[in-house]
Amino acid sequence: MLEIDNQTPLESDFLLLEKIANVLAPTQIIELILVSGETMREINRDLRGCDYATDVLSFPLEAIPHTPLGSVVINVPLAQENALKLGHSLENEIALLFIHGVLHLLGYDHEKDKGEQRQKEGELIKAFNLPLSLIERTQD
């Protein structure tokens, strides 16, 4: 199940994100928070000590029954900028960021694993007919 806290003017039905959430965590609640660039910078600074706005952050919660899996925070203006630059829709960019964030909630870590997160993202991108993944775009 997906709970959305949209703190931006973005209007969407978020059906694609609901489908992704149901595939990745069919029995768990995922909180999605859509924020401005400034809010993302504040969150990143306050919680991670990094004083810049990033595109997506994930905050897993403890595995306590009946609580959300965690929160995925997406910087909507930066997602829009990247979508325009890469030539695909904002909806697709947010879906890519959401997949990336939820995989982190599920314990994947592309900075430490041996390609498992990259492989899982690839599978989901094919399943949902999305453009190049976040990890693929940032590979050298």
Swiss-Prot record:
GO biological process: rRNA processing
EC number: 3.1.-.-
Intracellular or extracellular location(s): Cytoplasm
Keywords: Cytoplasm, Endonuclease, Hydrolase, Metal-binding, Nuclease, Ribosome biogenesis, rRNA processing, Zinc
Superkingdom, taxonomy of origin: Bacteria
Note describing how the cofactor binds: Binds 1 zinc ion.
EC class name: hydrolase
Primary localization: cytoplasm
NCBIfam families associated with the record: rRNA maturation RNase YbeY
Record's function text: Single strand-specific metallo-endoribonuclease involved in late-stage 70S ribosome quality control and in maturation of the 3' terminus of the 16S rRNA.
Name assigned to this protein: Endoribonuclease YbeY
Organism: Helicobacter pylori (strain P12)
GN (gene name): ybeY
